[in-house]
Curated annotation (Swiss-Prot):
The lineage of its organism: Eukaryota, Viridiplantae, Streptophyta, Embryophyta, Tracheophyta. GO terms for molecular function: serine-type endopeptidase inhibitor activity. Inhibits trypsin with a Ki of 0.25 uM. Inhibits the trypsin-like proteases in midguts of larval H.armigera, S.exigua, and P.rapae. It comes from Albizia kalkora (Kalkora mimosa). Heterodimer of an alpha and a beta chain linked by a disulfide bond. This is Kunitz-type trypsin inhibitor alpha chain. It comes from the Eukaryota.
Length: 53
């Protein structure tokens, strides 16, 4: 799996913007396979990370 930030840069799994490992962020992946992390109260979480499945 790879993650792209708002600029399209690949972020490594487990990196600071990896929503699957970041507390307070859940991945919301619709049938298309794309999703944005949902804000769940952790103010340190980025809002512009796209998860790639």
């Amino acid at each position: 799996k790879e993650l792209l930030d708002a600029d399209g840069d690949i972020l490594r799994n487990g990196g600071p913007a990896y929503p699957g490992l970041m507390p307070g962020v859940e991945r919301d992946l619709p049938a298309s396979g794309w999703g944005l992390p949902r804000r769940t109260g952790d103010e340190s979480c980025p809002l512009n990370v796209k998860a790639v499945r």
